[in-house]
C-alpha cells in the first residue's frame, strides 16, 4: 500500500484514499456493511461466498505470492525440503512439534486450515498454539519459541532480519499459492472511485511496472507476481 496508494493518488488526485489494513475476513465484513468501497483480499473461498451473496459488484485477479512453512533451523520435525505441505504438517503433528496458528479471520488462517483438512488432520493438543495475532507478530512468537508456522512469503522476507533462527522449510507447492483479488463493493459510498481503483490496479502498467518489481531492490526478488493480463 505504501507504493500503490501514492501511485493511485497521482493518477487520480480527485480521490482521498483511506487504507484500513486488516485480515481478509475482517475486510470482507467491512464490505458487507458498506464500510469499504473496494477490497484487496486473499481468501478465495470466502471471496466467492461474498460475491455469491451479492455483496460484491466486480472481482478481478491482481497478483499472487506464495505461502511458506517456516520453522527453526534445527527442524526437529524433519520437514525441510518436502514438496507436499500435507506431509510436512503430518510430520509436525506426529512429532508434536510446536506450531503457532493465527486463529483469526485472515486468508492465511483459512489456508492453514484448508491444508490441515487436505492432510486429513485435526490439530489439537498443547503443541498447537493460537496466537490470535497478525502475521508479523505470529512469526516473532514462532522465532522466539522455536516453533513452526505458515506465513506468506512477503511478510517473512520483510521481517526475516528480526526472526533469528527461523527459516523457510517448505515451499513451491501449487497448494501454497496465495492469490489476491480486488473487489468493488455493491454498497460502495464512492462507486466510481472503487471502479477507477479496480481498473487502475489491474492495468498492465501497474501489474508489471509496480507489482512485478516490488521488493526486487530490497530483497533481490519480487514479493508478488502479477496476475495474467
Regions found by a protein language model. Give the residues of each.
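Residue-level signal for tight coil/turn positions that link beta-strands
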Residues: 64-66, 96
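A short, structural micro-pattern
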Residues: 63-64, 176
